[in-house]
Amino acid sequence: MAEASASSAHPFDRAIALSPNGEGTFEGRTSEDYWNFTGPFGGVTAATLLNAAMRHEKRIGTPIAMTVNYCAPVAKGAFTIAVREVRTNRSTQHWTIELAQGDAGVAATATAVFAKRRETWAHHPSKMPEAPPPETLPELPTRGLMQWMQAYAFRFAKGMPSPPRPVPADDDLGPSLSHVWIADRPARPLDFLSLMSISDSFFGRIFHVRKSLIPIGTVSMTTYIHVDADEIAEIGSDYLLGVADTNVFNKGYSDQVAELWSRSGRLVATSHQIVYFRS
């Protein structure tokens, strides 16, 4: 992907922009447009790490899987990403990626798998949940909320989060499942990088369940991509239907399982997270 440095570039492209600095090394800076509570939105960090691998001169194929481990908050300012090719096979290629900030050390690590997809037999037993078209649903107001939330349009079909209350009430828990149409704002054609970011754009499941703003942070996220470049291009800048749920909250950690569907009913990506919470 070409470096996005022009002022006319989409905010997302500016946020993930990298400059090469020697073999397998890139330099970047955090973006105010995707700021979260204590650092950049985790999705844009994941996309930036993936961008480094995609820009490597030895990269083959397209991404099919990526695991990101968030080791520490990324501070405002510059960072360095180091990318290392671990092994290249006939059809797959494996990478390790590391983001560091000077004396603060490593803030995130990742492994990524790329593949040369081929035409094969296909079967799609999983079916997209029924949901009204996004245009028929109200957009969630995000003005005044975290900057990263203002970078997306959210239209909930199920599981709209309740207004946060100051103190959680365990005798009034909400559902953990949500169905939400998600798109970049302003609109931007979907690609592997923005898909990686959107895979982390679900609100914390504990916000839905306890109806309160509780400190959380993703510790590790794995995203699997089920489409190739042509299939992503067919989606354009349209909404994706995000389906997210959890299995357990226990002793400070919870999981999140998620799916992203195109409007046409194609499963585009799935993701799994382990999330820290303080309660």
Where are these regions (language model features)?
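Terminal targeting signals and extreme-terminal segments of soluble enzymes
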Residues: 1-279
